[in-house]
Amino acid sequence: PNYQFGNKATAYTATEIENYRKLLDDKSSNVFNDDQSLGGYGMGAKIRFPGEDNLNKGSYQDFGDIWLDFSAMGITDDNVQNYRRELNLQTGIASTEFSYKNVSYKREHFVSSPDQVMVTNLSASEKGKLNFSAKMELNNDNLEGKLTFDVRNQTCTIEGKVKDNDLKFRTTMKLLLTGGEITADEKNQVYRIKNADQVTIIMAAETDYKNDYPTYRDKEKNLSNVIDTRINDSSKKSYDELKQTHIEDHQSLFDRVSLDLGEFQTSVPTD
């Protein structure tokens, strides 16, 4: 909140920085004083920082919350078994597994840099066992926006701006089903999935930010076109294709270095 974008037009010059470095190297007692030898800008009261003349540097903001409700299946924290969560550093995929009424359930999550989308996949060991509701909410007082449903395309979109600096944003969630059926409760702004074999949730998000002083805005960017293109292109791929593309991209960097600490136990819990 209260983000003031931009760089100070008059910040440290290369000469000033070099002068400070020399004084630090020489252990000068004047480094932290208002030393006139530095043009009146010692590293004391008159130090000049980049950014605007205030202490508020802004903070990261969330685009919204995605809620998945499995109460229709009777699942609670107390009646599931074999619960396990994992973050696989080698694949860059987070997963959750558990069993309920002799059925094994699995959820996988990753963010794909090549496709510029976040992907969640829900599956079960038996067909027709996925029953839940999904919704997206704008739950951030620093943002203002509106939520729209596109029932035909099974999407939910939030579009708006940051209140303090008018930074525009747009995010879309799309549901892809294998088996089962999906209905839209537009009044409560929620999708209900019934008897599905597998569900893939694709989410894309974007802002009109541009690293270009002094406005830091891309007025030419059409957020609707950018998001729709990402969602449509990703939706044409199977979950396995999206997953494999992500893993290959992740491992192209991750596999450059390996560290062997000897024997280790994979069954030791982190809690």
Spans of features found by a protein language model:
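Aromatic-residue-lined binding/catalytic grooves and analogous aromatic/hydrophobic interfacial grooves
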Residues: 1-271
